[in-house]
Amino acid sequence: MNVTLVEINIKPERVDEFLDVFRANHEGAIQEPGNLRFDVLQDPRVKTRFFIYEAYKDEEAVMAHKKTPHYLACVDKLEALMSEPRKKRCFVGLMPE
């Protein structure tokens, strides 16, 4: 299992727009055959900080996700909404199998 944790910091005045843009990516991602989980989380202390927890069955599924129209549209719109570049960490999921 391939897991990615992405931190996204959004300009305060663009949070609602971010949620609209990212909702389309989320809804598309959870329909992908290789997707196991795709959670959008908001930091309760910093309302402009979001974390995306993505789990895919393998690297092939991750690469397929990055070619989907919903992902490409999201990335295209995201740049203008962010207050700083995204931070990404990749993991190998061990449990559950």
From Swiss-Prot:
PROSITE patterns tied to this protein: ABM
E.C. number(s) listed in UniProt: 5.3.1.32
Source taxon at top rank: Bacteria
Subcellular compartments: Cytoplasm
Pfam families on file: ABM (PF03992)
Keywords: Cytoplasm, Isomerase
CC per GO annotation: cytosol
Gene Ontology molecular functions: (4S)-4-hydroxy-5-phosphonooxypentane-2,3-dione isomerase activity; oxidoreductase activity
Disulfide cross-links: none
Catalysed transformations (reactions): (2S)-2-hydroxy-3,4-dioxopentyl phosphate = 3-hydroxy-2,4-dioxopentyl phosphate
Iron in keyword set: no
Keyword Ribosomal protein belongs to the record: no
Domain ABM: 2-91
Subunit annotation: Homodimer.
PANTHER family the record matches: (4S)-4-HYDROXY-5-PHOSPHONOOXYPENTANE-2,3-DIONE ISOMERASE, QUINOL MONOOXYGENASE YGIN-RELATED
Family per record: Belongs to the LsrG family.
Function: Involved in the degradation of phospho-AI-2, thereby terminating induction of the lsr operon and closing the AI-2 signaling cycle. Catalyzes the conversion of (4S)-4-hydroxy-5-phosphonooxypentane-2,3-dione (P-DPD) to 3-hydroxy-5-phosphonooxypentane-2,4-dione (P-HPD).
UniProt name for this protein: (4S)-4-hydroxy-5-phosphonooxypentane-2,3-dione isomerase
